[in-house]
Amino acid sequence: SKVSELNTQAQKARACGIYFADLNVLKAMKKPTTDIENVLVKLTTDLDIPFAIDIMKESAPANASKEELSKFMKNQENKLIDAMMENDKADVELELLGGMAVEYAIVYANPGLVVKGDAISAGLSENMEKRISIIQQITADLAKYYPDLEQLGTTIAPLSGMVATINTARESKAK
């Protein structure tokens, strides 16, 4: 499993957010979620947030309208935030919600990018380079209005190189 390659709490929390977003997307598309749920059990255990999985497993009402779906997701997010606060997990919460928000933005724009269960690690998928460049563009645009985001752009920049290097190393090892 590639999840073992996520070393820090922050990476795990971000990956957890990405997988939670994908879980919702797959549920909405009526696609199987077993792989992703297995990864989430692992990540939520590592992060000591077992309660999060119960909140995220709740399904939106069948045939929900866009408004109903949006309301459901907002409520789900609020429940998650409250539970995180009660359990003193604010640090994990920020990273997790960040991962979730970015993944939703990307999947809405390109539904083909849903992470395929545990086959591809949330941190190192072949889609990740695409994701990173999209995030870089978004942060660069927003930095004009939110100066704090400039720092984020600088943090993200070296990531695409790292992902590319890791993926190249993997490919050569696979041969």
Region locations from a protein language model:
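Short, charged, amphipathic alpha-helical segments
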Residues: 37-42, 56, 95, 122-130, ...
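Domain-length accessory/inserted modules outside core catalytic folds
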Residues: 23, 41, 48, 132, ...
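Regular secondary-structure segments
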Residues: 24, 102, 106-109, 160, ...
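N-terminal Sec/ER secretory leader and immediately downstream segment
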Residues: 1-66
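Exposed alpha-helical structural elements
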Residues: 2, 35, 39, 55, ...
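Extended amphipathic alpha-helical interaction segments
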Residues: 64-149
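A cross-kingdom marker for long, charged
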Residues: 144, 148-175
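General structural signal for alpha-helix termini and helix-helix connectors
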Residues: 25-29, 86, 110-114, 168-172
